[in-house]
Every structure is written in structure tokens, then in C-alpha cells.
């Protein structure tokens, strides 16, 4: 007999405005505890010192996490010029310095090389796995790692402000797997002056925005209350980038059993990914083919 999962069967999204000094996993654990939820997970790690959007999926919404991790994300960050660190952020040991300070036109010109499809080497202190071990664990032991470059789509990278000669504030919109610390490091190298991230904030991730996020302090204050539950957004928010197809009653019943089900299509093309709903509730995600949705993920709501 299977073990009964403890907690409430809550499905949806809680958008947290993560504070600095807290890991993404710690935020997820706090949300799970505060809501008494059976299951929770996040849609994209933020470094402990970073702030901003951490979208926490609850229950059946965890099945939609890939659609948020694959979505575009926006980061606002400050690069400290003239100083390189082991971690490529302000927490690390200083390993290089330079007196050179580029002018704004030089920075603007250098940013062009970081837009579009780029190849990016992750920071030494990152969660990338090297022969089964996390890079940050090996780096802490003093190993110098030769990490492979990875592709990254950068939709935009803009200079926002220049508070002084030592600092430049940037905003980047990018796809899955981007390391802002690598951008700061590589930009500093391109400018011949070194650089690291001084602070970082994720302002939006897919459909979720920081201004809609709840603070950890508020989560603590409202823990175990129905008022906190009112902050949970519908599961369907995680499917914002996919077309919705209303299912027929019979189609919904078949989809819930994992079988192809009839849906009412509009302008969805054959072979396109979509999600089916019935009476306002998500039923399944799948591939549309000739009047039916062939499910790949079924929601038990």
C-alpha cells in the first residue's frame, strides 16, 4: 500500500519576492510549510544574494514548471567594474583588479556582442554538474574547473544607468539557463577592466512579475491562514504561453484517463502544443491533432 502524502492538496502558483541571503530551496520549504502544502517546487533558481521573482509551484502546478523555466526572464543588475572575484559576485575573494574604466560609448559597443544567440561559460561557483558533482562544491575545494560553454538566447541587454565610473547598471532579458554573473565577468574582460555583479534582481519571469510577489515576511505573518491561500494564483498561469482549447465533456473524461480527447480548436495548428480546459479547469497539456488533444501531462484537480 502506498504512503499517504502529508499536507493539503493545493495546486497553483505563489509568486515570492525573494530577499537577499536566502536560497531558493529555503523559500520553497517555507512556502510549503506556511501553506501546509503536499508538494512544492520553484521555476528557476536565484542565487542566494539575488532578489526578485521566485515562482513557487504547488501541487499539480509543478507539472507546468517547464513552461516557466523555458520562458523569457528579466534581470536588473549592477556591475562593479575594475574588480574580478572568484564567484563573479560581491561575496567572492578578489582575484583581479584594474585601474581602467571604460566610457559609456565603449560599454554600449561591447554590449552588442552579448545579444542574440551567445555561448556562455558558467561561473566556477555554479550548480552545473561536473562528473556527478556540483561545480560549486569542487570550486570550494580549490579546484579550477574547465566548464564547457553553453548556448544562451539574450533577447536584450541595455545600459540603464552609470552611477559613477566604477558602476554600470544593466537590464537583460534572456532565455533559460542564463548566468548574470557570467555576463558581468565577460563584459569586464571585453572592456579590459574585469567586473562582477554587485547586486541582482529578477523583475519578471514568464507571466510572473516582482510587483505581484509576496514577501517572505508576509508569508511568515500569514502562515497557516486562509489569507495566505488567497495569494495563490491559478495553475493555468503557468500555461500562459500555450493556447487554451475547450474540451467537450466526453473529451475531458478521456483526457483525464490519459487518452486523446476531443477539443474545440480555433487557430491552433496540427502538431502544436496546447492545453485543454473543461468548465474553467485545466485538464491536460498535449499535442493538437485533427480535433483532439493528445495528452502529455494530465492534471488531477
UniProtKB/Swiss-Prot annotation:
Gene3D superfamilies the record matches: Pseudouridine synthase
Catalytic activity: uridine(55) in tRNA = pseudouridine(55) in tRNA
Pfam families named in the record: TruB_C_2, TruB_N
Family that this chain belongs to: Belongs to the pseudouridine synthase TruB family. Type 1 subfamily.
InterPro entries for the chain: PsdUridine_synth_cat_dom_sf (IPR020103), PsdUridine_synth_N (IPR002501), tRNA_psdUridine_synth_TruB (IPR014780), TruB_C (IPR032819)
EC numbers for this chain: 5.4.99.25
Reported function: Responsible for synthesis of pseudouridine from uracil-55 in the psi GC loop of transfer RNAs.
Enzyme class: isomerase
Stated name of the protein: tRNA pseudouridine synthase B
SUPFAM superfamilies xrefs: Pseudouridine synthase
Name of encoding gene: truB
Domain of life: Bacteria
Entry keyword annotation includes Metal-binding: no
Example GO biological process: mRNA pseudouridine synthesis
A single GO molecular function term of this UniProt record: tRNA pseudouridine(55) synthase activity
Entry keywords, A to Z: Isomerase, tRNA processing
Catalytic residues (positions): 47 (nucleophile)
Family matches, as PANTHER family: PSEUDOURIDYLATE SYNTHASE TRUB1 (PTHR13767:SF2), TRNA-PSEUDOURIDINE SYNTHASE (PTHR13767)
Amino acid at each position: 500500500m502506498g504512503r499517504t502524502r502529508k499536507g493539503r492538496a493545493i495546486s497553483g502558483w505563489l509568486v515570492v519576492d525573494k530577499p537577499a541571503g536566502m536560497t531558493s530551496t529555503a523559500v520553497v520549504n517555507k512556502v510549503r510549510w506556511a501553506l501546509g502544502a503536499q508538494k512544492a517546487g520553484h521555476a528557476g533558481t536565484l542565487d542566494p544574494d539575488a532578489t526578485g521573482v521566485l515562482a513557487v509551484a504547488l501541487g499539480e502546478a509543478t507539472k507546468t514548471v517547464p513552461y516557466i523555466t523555458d520562458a523569457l526572464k528579466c534581470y536588473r543588475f549592477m556591475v562593479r567594474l575594475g574588480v574580478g572575484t572568484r564567484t563573479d559576485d560581491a561575496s567572492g575573494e578578489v582575484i583581479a583588479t584594474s585601474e581602467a574604466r571604460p566610457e559609456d560609448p565603449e560599454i554600449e559597443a561591447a554590449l552588442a556582442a552579448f545579444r542574440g544567440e551567445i555561448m556562455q561559460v558558467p561561473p566556477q561557483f555554479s550548480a552545473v554538474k561536473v562528473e556527478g558533482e556540483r561545480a560549486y562544491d569542487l570550486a570550494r575545494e580549490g579546484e579550477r574547473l574547465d566548464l564547457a560553454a553553453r548556448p544562451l538566447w539574450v533577447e536584450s541587454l541595455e545600459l540603464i544607468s552609470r552611477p559613477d565610473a566604477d558602476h554600470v547598471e544593466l537590464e537583460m532579458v534572456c532565455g533559460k539557463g542564463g548566468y548574470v554573473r557570467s555576463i558581468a565577468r565577460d563584459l569586464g574582460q571585453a572592456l579590459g577592466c574585469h567586473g562582477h555583479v554587485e547586486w541582482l534582481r529578477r523583475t519578471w519571469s514568464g507571466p510572473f512579475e516582482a510587483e505581484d510577489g509576496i514577501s517572505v515576511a508576509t508569508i511568515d505573518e500569514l502562515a497557516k491562514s486562509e489569507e495566505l491561500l488567497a495569494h495563490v494564483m491559478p495553475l493555468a498561469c503557468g500555461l500562459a504561453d500555450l493556447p487554451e482549447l475547450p474540451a467537450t465533456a466526453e473529451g475531458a473524461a478521456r483526457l483525464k484517463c490519459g487518452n486523446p480527447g476531443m477539443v474545440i480548436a480555433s487557430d491552433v495548428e496540427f502538431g502544436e502544443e496546447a492545453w485543454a480546459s473543461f468548465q474553467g479547469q485545466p485538464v491536460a497539456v498535449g499535442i493538437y491533432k485533427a480535433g483532439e488533444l493528445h495528452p502529455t501531462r494530465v492534471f488531477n484537480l
